[in-house]
């Protein structure tokens, strides 16, 4: 992670605009923007142009950035005591990709970034991960398109639990209903049919859903 020990220096007007945008975006979406999203918002056609501004903000002590993560920007607080207090009450959960709630899509296992939440929200442990939902097949379970779901990593589940299931390298969120000769993954929307898995070699459970976070407009 890029970092600096220099004291903070005054920002230019452009740097301040982008810094404030990053703070606002992160607060509203529970994750930082990507370099491309920043460029699109400010009509900066070159990603190198955005990166140069981010590099200046890093050097001046306003942000950190993990170049290997698409959402690797971190806002730095200038209040050390406040930062320590916040850090002790929060935990960063990895976002490992998007998951289909509807027609399954190819699971993206590369880290998209992290989301910071209150430790009490999920009684968090180190084995929790987050995924972004795409689709409306679980709306009657209170899981909507664009929601961020939280799942505890585990390879088994009880009948009727909501799981993140992987089928042939694809991932989907469904109710888990196993039987002797197959697994039925049931949606929570009458528009969709259950997914029947006959060959268990192509099926695995990645985790059990334990929470959901939604952006409220």
Swiss-Prot record:
GO cellular component term, pick one: protein-DNA complex
Record bears the keyword Hydrolase: yes
CDD domains recorded: S24_LexA-like
Gene3D superfamilies associated with the record: Umud Fragment, subunit A, Winged helix-like DNA-binding domain superfamily/Winged helix DNA-binding domain
Site location (Cleavage): 101-102
DNA-binding residues (ranges): 35-55
One GO BP annotation of this record: DNA replication
Catalytic residues as annotated in Swiss-Prot or TrEMBL: 137 (for autocatalytic cleavage activity), 174 (for autocatalytic cleavage activity)
GO molecular function, one term: sequence-specific DNA binding
Taxonomy, superkingdom: Bacteria
Pfam assignment, any one: Peptidase_S24
Enzyme Commission number, as recorded: 3.4.21.88
Coiled coil start-end: none
Catalytic activity: Hydrolysis of Ala-|-Gly bond in repressor LexA
Keyword RNA-binding: no
Listed InterPro entries: LexA (IPR006200), LexA-like (IPR039418), LexA/Signal_pep-like_sf (IPR036286), LexA_DNA-bd_dom (IPR006199), LexA_repressor (IPR050077), Peptidase_S24_LexA (IPR006197), Peptidase_S24_S26A/B/C (IPR015927), WH-like_DNA-bd_sf (IPR036388)
Keyword terms of this UniProt record: Autocatalytic cleavage, DNA damage, DNA repair, DNA replication, DNA-binding, Hydrolase, Repressor, SOS response, Transcription, Transcription regulation
Family from the record: Belongs to the peptidase S24 family.
NCBIfam families named in the record: lexA
Record function comment: Probably represses a number of genes involved in the response to DNA damage (SOS response), including itself, recA, uvrA, ruvAB and ssb. The probable consensus LexA box is 5'-TGCAC-N4-GTGCA-3'. In the presence of single-stranded DNA, RecA interacts with LexA causing an autocatalytic cleavage which disrupts the DNA-binding part of LexA, leading to derepression of the SOS regulon and eventually DNA repair.
Subunit structure as annotated in this protein's UniProt entry: Homodimer.
HAMAP family reported for this sequence: LexA
Protein name: LexA repressor
Organism: Fibrobacter succinogenes (strain ATCC 19169 / S85)
Gene: lexA
């Amino acid at each position: 992670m890029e970092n600096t020990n220099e004291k903070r220096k005054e920002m230019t007007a452009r740097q301040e605009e982008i810094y404030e945008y990053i703070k606002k975006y992160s607060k509203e979406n529970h994750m930082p923007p990507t370099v491309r999203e920043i460029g699109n918002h400010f009509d900066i056609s070159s990603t190198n142009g955005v990166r140069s501004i981010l590099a200046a903000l890093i050097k001046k002590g306003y942000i950190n950035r993990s170049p290997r993560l698409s959402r690797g920007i971190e806002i730095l607080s200038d209040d050390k005591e406040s930062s320590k207090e916040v850090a002790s009450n929060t935990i960063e959960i990895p976002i490992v990709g998007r998951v289909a709630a509807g027609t399954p899509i190819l699971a993206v296992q590369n880290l998209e970034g992290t989301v910071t939440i209150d430790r009490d929200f999920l009684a968090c442990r180190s084995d929790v991960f987050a995924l972004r939902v795409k689709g409306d097949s679980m709306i009657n379970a209170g899981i909507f398109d664009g929601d961020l779901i939280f799942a505890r990593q585990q390879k088994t589940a009880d009948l009727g639990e909501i799981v993140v299931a992987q089928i042939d390298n694809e991932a989907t969120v469904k109710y888990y209903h196993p039987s002797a000769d197959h697994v039925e993954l049931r949606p929570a929307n009458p528009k969709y049919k259950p997914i029947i898995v006959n060959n268990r070699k192509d099926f695995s459970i990645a985790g059990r859903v334990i929470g959901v976070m939604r952006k409220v407009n």
